[in-house]
Amino acid sequence: MALIQVNYLSKVLFRTVPVNVILPSDKISFETLDYQGVPDGGYPTLFLLHGLLGNYTDWVSGTRIQRWAEDAGLAVVMPSGDNAFYIPGLAANSDYGAFVGEELPRVMRTMFPLSRRREDTFIAGLSMGGFGTLRNGMKYAETFSHLAAFSSGIHFFDPNYESLAGEESVFGDLAEAAKTDKSHYVVFEQLKARVAAGEVEAPKFWMSCGTEDSLMPVNLKFRDMLIDAGFDVTWDEEPRGHDWDFWDSQIKKVIDWLPLGEADATLGSGNVSRDL
């Protein structure tokens, strides 16, 4: 399993940005004792978003994503969201939505042997990244076939919500932002219309939240909206809070949920047995 740090000049953000990439390029077959090589069409790819206060290193340091991605033959791309909620910000060169939904897949596919097929391209995230997953996974549904949102911070547009993390510096006035596609509710309505018109295929959703998490009610509310609209939604909950123990468990479940097929057992560091 290769863990690669990339720094590239983002046209959208107009600066150099860091990205971590997990690439299962060094898997050695037990049968041939040689590298397996790139699958036909390239590696299926998960774009994985961190939460507030985090960066592109969070998922590697907080979970066992490397082990599970290697086992599944899955490439994982982890950008930095810079507390920007993965939306078009107020400042110039701050459209983090277009960065995640358009530019990042295109650039990563030019650098690495990643599949360009929608059915092999997925997006997931936690907390702020869960919001970014829902908003951008729906907005760019022509790119992403499966969305997985953990403990999603989708409470910004609740009139009873008190801003605690400087959200208005990114969204602007929340009442006004709620009327635009910065809101996942607006993008949800747009997606329903696009699917009904046959313009895009509906993505599949995984949503989850810890039962001890204060974000549970708003996540249940949005889950029910998706189900009522006829979307394919898998829901999961565990007796946990807003923490890495929950997200570590969830990312393994989601990798198992994704349409990846059966991966062959391979030889690797610390993994020398066929009995996997």
Predicted regions and their residues:
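Non-catalytic cap/lid and distal C-terminal segments of serine-dependent acyl enzymes
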Residues: 1-276
